[in-house]
């Protein structure tokens, strides 16, 4: 086979690329050099049980089949080296990274051991030892690069001065060539920001803040153009040279990247087909009778060679046999035995350094909550459209009511009672929706960020929830006061300042309850559209059962009457009815006494309507307020519990 241009002396990086065949453990015994950090993965296997049929097919749903995702994978890599894990979609690349980093869910069966500097790690130590950059870059879009990294540093590192955080962030940005975009916003699909390659660098920078010795990156070049992908790999290779272990998975690598990797591993259906240096890879496949053609991309050639072609049954059998032959050949090769020897030698070598845990001395619970609150507030305050809509969406609804009703009357023949009942019904029914719309629009991105950062150990998911709750409280109060101030006096409701205060307080509660109920459901259901539908259904049902406006509560079936006590609409409606109707006197047809016998003239005082619609509500006015506002902390506590459970389920 002719010499490949990227393995010639001019194209290679000198001794850096050739050191994989002789580990530093062996070098140390010869030259006496200081041993470096090492990562060993020994006989790792992972399988899950899947149901045969869909959940609605009871017979087939009860049957299960075991799926082997990883099978007897062993790797060895040292600091100063970068390893590339190749494989087609579904080959187990991401699962292998999850297994090494301790992020695999416990729903499957994991076997094997992971060693760092010869020490087997416990599950609770994985998070403190490895940094993991996911394939998707999830950030708060309205923060700048500098702010994003600074808040991450404040969450991850010990409490210190602002100068300490600034120096740390500036050093990392300089190392990753981000200084020129430090004050640019991250951006999103709604508005421009930094480029995809720069976003990927920010993801890497966020992990580097804790000085990790082992970094893993899942598909870091996916979605990037050729030049940017090459720059990212060069950057990672440079990071590896600075006494780090770097492992990346790549789906479709370019030939130019071949020379930058110290070790290359190839996975097929969860089995290791090869793991070694680029030179060892060329020699291994050449000895197996599959030399790489001159001027071909070794990545493409050997990925095609180790993939199973499922286009036809004959091709599938043929290619599967070839892959099995290559797997057996690798397990019998000196390269594989050298991997096992290095892992075993590291376990008993006493000169290796201790396990290199990340620099991690984070602030306490309330310190993290304060950082999250400041970060959430700064991010959401820059979203001008969201801020404006939060403040005026209730007011917009109120303006429609004003244009429709103009001003409520005291004449029962002109709809004095009916107009007030319709107004209160709309107010109690609409205010939870505005809260729900806010949460559905703003919280899913915060949830995505917290899902990722909580896996990095920066904080717990419920702390992000509580930070959002504290952030929305003042906005909700201001929005409700603006809405109430315009609607209450313009519509001509009971002209008393104290009544206006009760009115505003009564409408604030369902607005908050609607938003917090949405947050609770967002902790259970991933799709915001489904949450939207659930909240709408619950709000309509609660209003029908609890308000007493559609059907007299006393005439309801006992189960519905009992169910009404668990709806916040019952207490809110009783408060608003008493607040508006108590002490109110109605006229009927003016001075025309012939109209006094009209059925609509039966109600001449507001107290009559109160006793007819919600008997005893006047005496329960204070209790109703306490119960209504009791829903708010109850939902917050329920949300914290659910997000704690979510934290556990994602990490298990």
Curated annotation (Swiss-Prot):
Its cofactor is Mg(2+). Changing residue 592 to Q: Loss of one N-glycosylation site. Abolishes N-glycosylation. Residues 1-384, 444-468, 523-529, 646-652 are cytoplasmic. Signal peptide: none annotated. Changing residue 93 to R: Strongly reduces cholesterol transport activity, but has little effect on biliary secretion of campesterol and sitosterol. No effect on ATP-binding and on expression of ABCG5 and ABCG8. Residues 389-646 form the ABC transmembrane type-2 domain. It is linked to A spontaneous mutation gives raise to thrombocytopenia and cardiomyopathy (trac), with recessive inheritance and fully penetrant phenotype. Mice are small, infertile, and have shortened lifespan. The lineage of its organism: Eukaryota, Metazoa, Chordata, Craniata, Vertebrata. Induction: Up-regulated in liver and small intestine by cholesterol feeding. Up-regulated via the oxysterols receptor LXR/retinoic X receptor (LXR/RXR) pathway. Endotoxin (LPS) significantly decreased mRNA levels in the liver but not in the small intestine. ATP binds at residues 87-94. A lipid is attached at residue 61 (S-palmitoyl cysteine). One of its GO terms (molecular function) is ATP binding. Disruption phenotype: Mice deficient for both Abcg5 and Abcg8 appear healthy and are fertile, but display strongly increased levels of the food-derived plant sterols sitosterol and campesterol in liver and blood plasma. When mice are fed chow containing 0.02% cholesterol, cholesterol levels in blood plasma and in liver are considerably lower than in wild-type. In spite of the increased plasma and liver levels of plant sterols, and the decreased cholesterol levels, the total sterol levels in plasma and liver are closely similar in wild-type and mutant mice. Belongs to the ABC transporter superfamily. ABCG family. Eye pigment precursor importer (TC 3.A.1.204) subfamily. It is found in: Cell membrane; Apical cell membrane. Changing residue 585 to Q: Loss of one N-glycosylation site. Abolishes N-glycosylation. Residues 1-25 are annotated as: Disordered. InterPro entries: AAA+_ATPase (IPR003593), ABC2_TM (IPR013525), ABC_transporter-like_ATP-bd (IPR003439), ABC_transporter-like_CS (IPR017871), ABCG_dom (IPR043926), ABCG_transporters (IPR050352), P-loop_NTPase (IPR027417). This is ATP-binding cassette sub-family G member 5.
């Amino acid at each position: 086979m002719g010499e490949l241009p990227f393995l010639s002396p001019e194209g290679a990086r000198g001794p850096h690329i050739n050191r994989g065949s002789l580990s530093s453990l062996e070098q140390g015994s010869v030259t006496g050099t200081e041993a470096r950090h090492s990562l060993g993965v020994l006989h790792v296997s992972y399988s899950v049980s899947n149901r045969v049929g869909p959940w609605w097919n009871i017979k087939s749903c009860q049957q299960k089949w075991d799926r082997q995702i990883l099978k007897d994978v062993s790797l060895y890599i040292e600091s100063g080296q970068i390893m590339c894990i190749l494989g087609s979609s579904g080959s187990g690349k991401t699962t292998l990274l999850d297994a090494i980093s301790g992020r695999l869910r416990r729903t499957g069966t994991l076997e094997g051991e992971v060693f760092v500097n010869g020490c087997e790690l416990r599950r609770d130590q994985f998070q403190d030892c490895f940094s993991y950059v996911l394939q998707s870059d999830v950030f708060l879009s309205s923060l700048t690069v500098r702010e994003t990294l600074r808040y991450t540093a404040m969450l991850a590192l010990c409490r210190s001065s602002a100068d300490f955080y600034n120096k740390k962030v500036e050093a990392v940005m300089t190392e990753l060539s981000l200084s020129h975009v430090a004050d640019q916003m991250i951006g999103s699909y709604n508005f421009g920001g930094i480029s995809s390659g720069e976003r990927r660098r920010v993801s890497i920078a966020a992990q580097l803040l804790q000085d990790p010795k082992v970094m893993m990156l899942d598909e870091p070049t996916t979605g990037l153009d050729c030049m940017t992908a090459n720059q990212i790999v060069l950057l990672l290779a440079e990071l590896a040279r600075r006494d780090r272990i770097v492992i990346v998975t790549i789906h479709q690598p370019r030939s130019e990247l071949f020379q930058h990797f110290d070790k290359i591993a190839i996975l097929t259906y969860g089995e290791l087909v090869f793991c070694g240096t680029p030179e060892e890879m060329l020699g291994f496949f050449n000895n197996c009778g599959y030399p790489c053609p001159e001027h071909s991309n070794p990545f493409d050639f050997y990925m095609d060679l180790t993939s199973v072609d499922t286009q036809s049954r004959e091709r599938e059998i043929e290619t599967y046999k070839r892959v099995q032959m290559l797997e057996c050949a690798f397990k019998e090769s000196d390269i594989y035995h050298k991997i096992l020897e290095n892992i075993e030698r590291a376990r008993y070598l006493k000169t290796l350094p201790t396990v290199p845990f990340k620099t991690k001395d984070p602030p306490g619970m309330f310190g993290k909550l304060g950082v999250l609150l400041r970060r959430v507030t700064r991010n959401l305050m820059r979203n001008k459209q969201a801020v404006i809509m939060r403040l005026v969406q209730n007011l917009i609804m109120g303006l429609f009511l004003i244009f429709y009703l103009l001003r409520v009357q005291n004449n029962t023949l002109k709809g004095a009672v009916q107009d007030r009942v319709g107004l209160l019904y709309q107010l109690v029914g609409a205010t939870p929706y505005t809260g729900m719309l806010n949460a559905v629009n703003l919280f899913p991105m915060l949830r995505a960020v917290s899902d990722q950062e909580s896996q990095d150990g920066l904080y717990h998911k419920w702390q992000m929830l509580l930070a959002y709750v504290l952030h929305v409280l003042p906005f909700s109060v201001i929005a409700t006061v603006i809405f109430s101030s315009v609607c209450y006096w313009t519509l001509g409701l009971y002209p008393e300042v104290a009544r206006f205060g009760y009115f505003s307080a009564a409408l604030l509660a369902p607005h908050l309850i609607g938003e917090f109920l949405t947050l609770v459901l967002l902790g259970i259901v991933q799709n915001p559209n489904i949450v939207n539908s659930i909240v709408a259904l619950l709000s309509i049902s609660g209003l029908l059962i609890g308000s007493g406006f559609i059907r007299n509560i006393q005439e309801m079936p006992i189960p519905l009457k009992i169910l009404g006590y668990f709806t916040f609409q019952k207490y809110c409606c009783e408060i608003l009815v008493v607040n508006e109707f108590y002490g109110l006197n109605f006229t009927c047809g003016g001075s025309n006494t012939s109209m006094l016998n009209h059925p609509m003239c039966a109600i001449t005082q507001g107290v009559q309507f109160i006793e007819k619609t919600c008997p005893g509500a006047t005496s329960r006015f204070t209790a109703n307020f306490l119960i209504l506002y009791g829903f708010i902390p109850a939902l917050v506590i329920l949300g914290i519990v659910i997000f704690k459970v979510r934290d556990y389920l994602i990490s298990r």
